[in-house]
Amino acid sequence: MSYEIITYDPDTGTDEHGDYRTQREARQGLKLYRQEPAALIYDLDRWRIVYRRGYWPAGALPIERGCNA
């Protein structure tokens, strides 16, 4: 499995950070982005959001498998 951290700022939009092998590594890496208004951990293999914090407008969220786009 691989995970990615995606952050969101209303002024700059979304930004992708790193590739992590485990969800635990991704949660540790997320601590680096505490100052960001919103952040999430995205499972790249299953196309699912596994953790989300902060406000995300609908257009800024990544696509999830099994959800209507």
Model-derived segments and their meaning:
Residues 8-23, 63-68:
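Acidic interaction surfaces
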